[in-house]
Amino acid sequence: MATTHLTAALALLCALLQVDIEASSWWSLAMNPVQIPEAYIVGAQPLCSQLPGLSPGQKKLCQLYQDHMPYIGEGAKTGIKECQYQFRHRRWNCSTVDNASVFGRVMQIGSRETAFTYSISAAGVVNAVSRACREGELSTCGCSRAARPKDLQRDWLWGGCGDNLEYGYRFAKEFVDAREREKIHTKGSYESSRTLMNIHNNEAGRRTVYNLADAACKCHGVSGSCSLKTCWLQLADFRKVGDFLKEKYDSAASMRLNARGKLVQVNSRFNPPTTNDLVYVDTSPDYCVRNESTGSLGTQGRLCNKTSEGMDGCELMCCGRGYDQFKTVQTERCHCKFHWCCYVKCKKCTEIVDQFVCK
């Protein structure tokens, strides 16, 4: 009898370990900045074997492009921060957890939220690698060689050192999609649909960065006159990328696998999603209450806006459970005056503010 219980316990432990392994992600590079060793130390473990969350294919790319790894981590961090900004007033607010999965079990569900997270993190890598190329931080790329835009005025020069979107896009595609492409699933399985979903949303994120990049120009001339302009390709502010993908989140398409193993739209009356749209295969879990099986952290203790009727309002954020009120003291600069020459002097003002948190 004891042997039976021991066997069952070991089986459960192995299953839990397997879930943890599968849930680990390259996103974890955002939580622990990658340090490239300046010199090789005899007996030291290779860098790539020490990095958590990398798939076999990603480890191979790491070995070939070690100098890229800090920027992959930087891109993931940029994506996570933007995700948290975009969802700061939602029940699910892109919270991270303290393990290699970064977002916990909630990413094991193929929901709209998962779709956004995959897209914004892939976008972050394109952003970081493209800029690193321009700044001369990587050994295999440099300034952009993008063709001159057709709508650029004839007398403006196309040159300078632009962000290398072409390289950033290609490398992000190879690295981020490596985990998905090396998976082998039974045709028609749920796992197969998740892989297709992830690849689609990764691509949507990358294309958003690529498509939003635009020409930036600098004037040249005597006494600041703009008799000549030099222009180059420049990344859009990442907030624009986040705003665009948040709109795509709101209009994301519900998908299912067809008999041929392809993702098709559940509601065929709508236009099929393009490569710029987000797709999902599962309905979102209930984010109102904490649930370890789905990874939902719930909204208990979240700040809410008593006067808002939107998602940040106490009625919706607290899911009808009610809220508690407390007072906080806030200090800010006030009564600022400019003094000649040349500084601004301010006083400090304090006020007592009512705040509300979900029960």
From Swiss-Prot:
Signal sequence range: 1-20
Recorded hits in Pfam families, A to Z, give: wnt
Cross-referenced PROSITE patterns: WNT1 (PS00246)
Among its keywords, does the record have Translocase?
Answer: no
List cystine links. C83-C94, C133-C141, C143-C161, C217-C231, C219-C226, C288-C319, C304-C314, C318-C358, C334-C349, C336-C346, C341-C342
GO molecular function: any one? frizzled binding
Tissue spec: Neuroectodermal and non-neuroectodermal tissues.
Cite the entry's keywords alphabetically.
Developmental protein, Disulfide bond, Extracellular matrix, Glycoprotein, Lipoprotein, Secreted, Signal, Wnt signaling pathway
CDD domains per the record?
A: Wnt_Wnt5a (cd19347)
**What's the PTM story here?**
Palmitoleoylation is required for efficient binding to frizzled receptors. Depalmitoleoylation leads to Wnt signaling pathway inhibition.
Q: Which GO terms describe its cellular component?
A: extracellular space
**Recorded family membership:** Belongs to the Wnt family.
**Role noted for this protein:** Ligand for members of the frizzled family of seven transmembrane receptors. Can activate or inhibit canonical Wnt signaling, depending on receptor context. Required during embryogenesis for extension of the primary anterior-posterior axis.
- What's the protein here called? Protein Wnt-5a
Q: Which organism is it from?
A: Ambystoma mexicanum (Axolotl)
| Name of encoding gene | WNT-5A
